[in-house]
A protein has these predicted regions:
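Acidic, mature catalytic/reactive cores of soluble proteins
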Residues: 1-249
Length: 249
């Protein structure tokens, strides 16, 4: 933000010195000298053209984009595992959307396909922040191959909507997070007492792993509320929660 830079002259001076004296490194990050929407400056590892290439893969529903968020590993690797040979041994990593098929890391945590709320939340917040710099004219196809082009804010809204669908009732009255259990889906004692699972099945959205992971899966509470147009992730979690207090709804 321009007013923030004005309050940090030493930071700006050191930053500009570094960018001018190390052009080899400056060429790898965003163009600091080019102001964006509202004269904002962008300091990021990805430039616009690289972001579009990354999002083309991330927003592909045959790869990372699930009905319920962004997968931790591309679904492409379900049929095409990544293979590595080292010192006569062969290792492979394939897409595993639910419970781990390996005893590594205790066997109950899996980063090879499921949807993880903390990573998805950071993606959503980052997209909102990039939109504050690029504005509505910077668009990407979402989902990839659909012919529908959205601003980064609209992409963030779409990913956020999918994450919320983990917990909200669908048209069939089911909550994806509760899986195929008739008791959890229909019994009044369970169907509305939603648990915050550690991670979620990359295809079905069913809750997996520890079932009381409120420390991060509870972040969906922030996504369920409408986001003000000017909201920034620079607001603390407490400030965001106060803005969503029951008395303010």
């Amino acid at each position: 933000e321009p007013d923030l830079l004005a309050r940090l002259p030493n930071f700006r001076r050191r930053m500009e010195w570094f960018l001018s004296h190390r052009p080899d490194l400056a060429a790898l990050v965003s163009r600091w000298q080019e102001p964006g929407l509202g004269e904002r400056r962008l300091l990021a590892l990805v430039r616009g053209h690289r972001m579009k290439r990354l999002l083309r893969r991330m927003l592909d529903d045959t790869e990372f984009l699930s009905k319920y968020g962004v997968r931790a590993l591309s679904k492409y690797h379900e049929a095409h595992p990544y293979m590595l040979e080292h010192e006569g041994m062969r290792f492979g990593v394939g897409y595993v959307p639910g419970e781990s098929n390996s005893g590594l890391f205790g066997g109950n945590s899996n980063w090879r396909g499921p949807i993880w709320m903390p990573v998805n939340y950071l993606l959503v917040e980052s997209l909102y922040e990039f939109h504050r710099y690029y504005g509505d004219d910077f668009k990407v196809e979402c989902p990839t191959g659909s012919g529908r082009f959205l601003s980064l804010r609209e992409v963030a809204d779409e990913v956020s909507r999918r994450l919320c669908c983990l917990f909200l009732r669908g048209e069939d009255g089911r909550r994806a997070v509760l899986g195929d259990s008739p008791m959890m889906q229909r019994d009044p004692a369970f169907r509305d007492n939603v648990l915050f699972y550690e991670y979620f099945h990359g295809d079905t959205g069913q809750g997996v792993g520890a079932s009381h992971q409120t420390g991060w899966s509870g972040l969906v509470a922030l996504l369920l509320h409408p986001r003000p147009a000017a909201a920034s992730c620079s607001l603390s979690i407490n400030e965001r929660m106060e803005a969503h207090a029951p008395g303010s709804l």
